Amino acid sequence: MTKRLTHEIPGEFGEPFLRWLGATTEKAWSRCAEPTLADFERRGAGGCDWRRGTRWTGGLSDAELAEIEQRFAVRFPAEHRLFLQVLHATEPRMFCAGFDDDDRLVADEAPGFYHWQRDEAAIRAAFAGVIDGLLFDVENNALWRDSWGPRPSDADERRARVAALVAGAPRLLPIYGHRYVLAEGPTLVLSVWQSDIIVYGRDLRDYLLHELVDAEYERPAIVDTAAIPFWGELIG
């Protein structure tokens, strides 16, 4: 995307910023080349790219948000809620490429920013993936923190202990790929890949600019993550 000056970006997170972000990204997506499998073959790697003409779906109503929160047993923090009320999700699905069992690149598709009404299976998989990723490192990479208590000798008991720890921690709400919004405390956006967890956005505005817009802007102050229950010990 085109480099933009800091003063062109609305300074506060709010509806004007989100409207600006929507217009800016849709303009860029209207001009980008349609991705092809050949693009990924030249790179020698899999991944996902935005399709030409990608657009935001538009926001959810209060009633729709209430139904979603009940269905998924979540509570969106204020900034995430406003994002869902103004922009919500992207369409069409992203063009993706991945390797098959014969190590050949094959075309696929995946959600961009999750649509909380249409992407239920993907969202539930993203929730489950948090625990599954941690358990992979528990079983294969010697992950077990002293603060978790004694390491059970039984695999089912280890799974139950990790699941209980995650259940007692602030929820991680899927927003895009393996990026998650912290549901309680500072509105951080975390990149979560197994137990490799980093801060990808110091707040939602910072995250959206980082993810979507090639721009120079003043980043918010670094957030002290050490006090975040459970996740703080894992954030690198």
Residue ranges of model-derived segments:
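A surface-exposed partner-binding patch
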Residues: 2-167, 173, 177
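Structured loops at beta-to-helix junctions and adjacent beta-edge loops in soluble globular domains
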Residues: 87, 176-178, 193-195, 202, ...
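Low-complexity, glycine/alanine/valine/leucine- and proline-rich hydrophobic stretches
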Residues: 183-215
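Short, well-ordered loop/turn elements at secondary-structure boundaries
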Residues: 167-171, 176, 184-186, 193-194
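Short alpha-helical interface patches
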Residues: 62-70, 204-215, 236
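Low-complexity, Gly/Ser/Thr/Pro-rich intrinsically disordered linker/tail segments
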Residues: 220-236
